[in-house]
């Protein structure tokens, strides 16, 4: 297996999950596989010059986004940038440690690769094994989801995974509140965002 290509595919998979979390939504295992199988055939190894340029540009970009509210778009983007730089530093440590970067020859476009579900599982295993901010969870109805934790916390991800079952949503929220704080949850809480559960269902 080509190491440079595998790293590029890892970045692609992380980006796919991140985009869903940016939209405040989870992605199922099946949907993620479909997206990867659709986009990966054209994914090329990432040039070292591109890696270094983005890695070195992130600190200044992150600095400009500091001192914003925790739930603001700017703060979320700042967290994404920090995680992305950590990902580059971990995944491309060898490439980034090169003392002198020579001009890379332009690569000719290659034909689309054949990507199998088995290869998707290989890339996914590498993503989950690394510290890239990608987390998985299994919902009450045994569906498997993924999310990017710097943009979508584990507790909010669990909340999203119960949206198709208001009873489970209430139970999970009460359990989580009791575990973390602990404190009771007012019954009227569930009538408002992000729950918006019908009062008749709550009662």
Q: Where on the chain are the PLM-derived regions?
A:
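C-terminal non-catalytic scaffold/interaction domains in large multidomain proteins
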Residues: 1-203
């Amino acid at each position: 297996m080509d190491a440079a290509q595998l790293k590029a595919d890892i970045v692609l998979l992380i980006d796919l999950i991140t985009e869903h979390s940016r939209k405040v939504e989870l992605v199922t295992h099946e949907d993620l596989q479909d997206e990867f199988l659709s986009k990966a055939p054209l994914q090329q190894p990432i040039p070292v010059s591109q890696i270094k340029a983005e890695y070195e540009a992130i600190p200044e970009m992150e600095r400009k986004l500091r001192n914003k509210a925790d739930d603001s778009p700017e703060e979320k983007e700042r967290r994404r940038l920090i995680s992305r730089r950590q990902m580059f530093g971990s995944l491309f440590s060898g490439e980034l440690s090169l003392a002198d970067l020579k001009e890379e020859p332009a690569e000719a476009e290659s034909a689309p690769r054949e990507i199998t579900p088995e290869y998707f599982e290989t890339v996914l295993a590498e993503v989950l094994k690394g510290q890239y901010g990608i987390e998985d969870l299994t919902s009450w109805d045994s569906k498997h989801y993924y999310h990017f934790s710097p943009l979508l916390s584990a507790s909010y991800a669990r909340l999203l995974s119960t949206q198709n079952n208001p009873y489970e949503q209430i139970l999970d929220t009460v359990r989580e509140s009791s575990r973390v704080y602990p404190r009771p949850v007012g019954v009227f809480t569930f009538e408002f965002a992000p729950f918006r559960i019908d009062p008749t269902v709550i009662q």
